[in-house]
Amino acid sequence: LNAPTREERLANLKEVLKTTNFPPAVPQYINNHIHTTYSFSPYSPTAAVYAARMEGLCTAGIIDHDSISGAREFLEAAELIQMPVTIGMECRASMDGTAMEGKRTNNPDQVGVSYMTIQSVPHDKIDEVNAFFAPYREARHRRNRAMVEKINALLDGIALDYDRDVLPLSEAKENGGVTERHLM
């Protein structure tokens, strides 16, 4: 379910479903904040839906950083599994100019910056939402490249290359988010 392409992943899911018996869905088991390979999780959207249902979740939601590019695959996998799902994304937001300015909220690394989610994006707005966040993904790439330079300054005899070593670990080619975790 983590094959290289969306088409392969969904085809593999169809095969797996022929022999899968899911446990009963538990009404209290809900997770509408599931990251996928489109930000930093090792699970493809297909694998995430499958794993959620195997754990007895009655519903699930995709939330990737700065990207909603995995949403269509998540929806297709959910349809095959017959599981209701939501789609959304997560981004960092500056709290400057608000009552939360200068305060630490839910981001342990930055004062005055909060992680915010957009939930239940209408399916016909996926492209619009993703296009809106394209500049944020570009800013993240610049920040990540600067971090790679700082990491390389600490290394002796080896060097990390963002394009060669980091981007292939992500779904950046499909407008997925590349996070600090890809650098680890």
Put a short name on every predicted segment:
Residues 14-22, 29:
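Conserved oxyanion/phosphate-binding beta-strand-loop segments in alpha/beta enzyme cores
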Residues 24-174, 178:
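A metal-dependent hydrolase metal-coordination microenvironment
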Residues 181-184:
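Short, intrinsically disordered, charge-balanced linker/junction segments flanking boundaries
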Residues 1-14:
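Low-complexity, highly charged intrinsically disordered N-terminal segments
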